Amino acid sequence: PVLGAANPRTGNNINDDGRPVILVIGDSLSAEYGLQRGQGWVQLLANRLQKSGSNYTVVNASISGDTTSGGRTRLPALLKQHRPSIVIIELGGNDGLRGLPVARMQDNLAAMVRASQAMGARVVVAGIRMPANYGREYTERFYAAFANVAKQHDAALVPFLLEGFSDSPDFFQADRIHPSAQAQARILQTVWPVLEPMILAKAPAKARS
């Protein structure tokens, strides 16, 4: 199985109105697969920023079914178009579900971090775990890859995107792969403590005035 099938949606970008951009490049875990529009954690993040008066805008460039190879291919054009201040990379789940080499996934993630940083963006890497039936050796190497990339390239890390509910069927859709609507706030709670310091550390001048 692969993680989903929904279309990416984009928001305002810094080239249009001068607002700093948070770019989320991910798969169905960020693309509202199986959810009503507006229920996903990325939209909840945008809502939180808006309610707090933050000057940031969120661009969701997530595509269900995407892999790190797909993200690596798509990212340069997204960076050029949106000039993000922060990039959240939420990819790798489909690499794992397909049993693709961990070394290749790690190389793709590292390339995406470097490309984002080269454009002046700060980066958050969101990790994911594979089910135990993929074998201990593979699942451990897979999970470690996200931390390795973050450490080697001085990126922030969300160790496990589905922290706190991955073993709770009530928080998943019928396929037991994709988080349900009620899980989306939990995902944001996991991402927010890592993301918030980035937002506060370099508040845009427009927000401070």
Language-model regions, residue ranges each:
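Structured catalytic cores of enzymes that bind and process phosphorylated ligands/cofactors
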Residues: P1-P8, V123, S180
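Serine-esterase "nucleophile elbow" of acetyl-processing enzymes
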Residues: L3-S64, R74-R83
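Alpha-helical cap/lid subdomain in secreted, periplasmic
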Residues: S54, G70-S209
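Acidic-and-aromatic substrate-binding clefts and catalytic sites of carbohydrate-active enzymes
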Residues: G65-S69
